[in-house]
Amino acid sequence: YIWSRRIFKKKLSNKNNIVIALDRDSKTLTTARKLTKEFKDRFIFVNEKFSNIDKLKFSNRNLKAIIFDLGYSINQINDLEKGLSFNSKGKLNMRLGKNLISAHDVVNKMPYEELSKVFRYFGEEQKSKIIAKNIINIRSKKIILTEDLVNIIENIKKKHSKINKSTKVFQSLRILVNNEISQLMLGLINSFKLLPIGGILAVVTFHSIEDRIVKFFFKNYSEDKKNSRYFPEIKKNKKIFKIINKKPITPSKNEIILNPPSRS
């Protein structure tokens, strides 16, 4: 919502330009209607994963920029039905689309070894093994609500830390449930294929795992490229990215105060 409004206000003085916004969460349609009402047919909302951006029917010759905002909206975080946040008291769901598996399924059914790896690799949680072990021991009673999981984590992580003790575990579950890693990689690859010469690709990340993938992608598809087994090989004389910002742009102290989630 904020990105689209800013683009219209700052960049799209030409009334022939349009914004096409993608979101896999169907509830975003409510917000999208506000923009449609304000900007008419210059704003188009598509209820779709951004990994499927290549399936949209538009001429890539007229495509000027693609922006990925990998964070969750305040509405999504506060939605008790989604159970995305450790600060909300809702069911352990975390699904943004028509996913078959919920966070409840993962926490209550996944074997110890796999659960421990999820916390370790997707959340970089140092106490992944002991948290997974305690979940296994407790889940015979069923772990249903977000606060049930928070209580397990807080009983293990006693020491005070700069971030909430549940941050990494909840992050890892969101990544797994919504298949975020492969969605991001596919979205980046398909964007590269779509963008014409001179097109812009900007990505807003919110944690180190996303950040590493994006940096790796740009390095692989830039002037300093080295072919990678994780991304398709670029043939010689093909278009490549010119990296504008060698270092990521991070939020100011004032922005963090106004928008705490941006601290990531």
What feature does the model see in each segment?
Residues 1-264:
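S-adenosyl-L-methionine-dependent methyltransferase catalytic core, i.e., the SAM/SAH-binding region
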